[in-house]
UniProtKB/Swiss-Prot annotation:
This is Large ribosomal subunit protein uL15. Binds to the 23S rRNA. Part of the 50S ribosomal subunit. SUPFAM superfamilies: Ribosomal proteins L15p and L18e. Residues 1-13 have a biased composition (Basic and acidic residues). Coiled coil: none annotated. The gene is rplO. It comes from the Bacteria. Residues 1-51 are annotated as: Disordered. One of its GO terms (biological process) is translation. Pfam families: Ribosomal_L27A. NCBIfam families: rplO_bact (TIGR01071). One of its GO terms (molecular function) is structural constituent of ribosome.
Length: 160
């Protein structure tokens, strides 16, 4: 096979339907838009506008509250950390902090900190320093002979 022999699979690339090109095309005159009215013109309608009727987004009550100082943690699972330890990208003999986790490529960003969850198996004896961890993640690391130190004050209080 050569570059000049490459082709799309049959039916993969559909040809654009050219409209308003005479009655023989099947899409002549009104080009499949019907007759007159706002929808037959260019620009069509504004999303959410219901012709003067009170729109749905205004008929329903406002709900909820967004905390202005909410912390957003990057989630990392134990199984993924173990995978990086096995691959040699994280050194289990050294203390592992959030910067080491990001540098190894376990997660691309740490946002307001890293929260460790217990999904997956952990066999390496790790010393982790992170912003948060689930109770089951703390138990799993301690069972493997390691330890987790929590840096976020709220997370440290909730894990105890």
């Amino acid at each position: 096979m050569k570059l000049n022999e490459l082709r799309d699979n049959e039916g993969a690339a559909r040809k654009k339907k050219r409209v308003a090109r005479g009655p023989g095309s099947g899409k002549g005159k009104t080009a499949g838009r019907g007759i007159k009215g706002q929808k037959s013109r260019s620009g069509v309608a504004l999303n959410g506008y219901e012709g003067g009727q009170m729109p749905l987004y205004r008929r329903l009550p406002k709900r909820g509250f967004s905390k202005p100082n909410r912390k957003e943690y990057a989630v990392v699972n134990l199984g993924l950390i173990q995978k990086f330890v096995d691959a040699g990208k994280l050194d289990a003999s050294q203390p592992i902090d959030e910067n080491a986790i990001v540098a190894a490529g376990v997660t691309s960003h740490k946002r307001d900190g890293i929260r460790v969850l217990a999904k997956g198996e952990i066999t390496a004896k790790l010393t982790l320093t992170v912003a948060g961890a689930s109770k089951s993640a703390v138990e799993a690391v301690e069972k493997a002979g390691g330890s987790i130190t929590l840096t976020a004050p709220a997370a440290a209080a909730s894990a105890e």
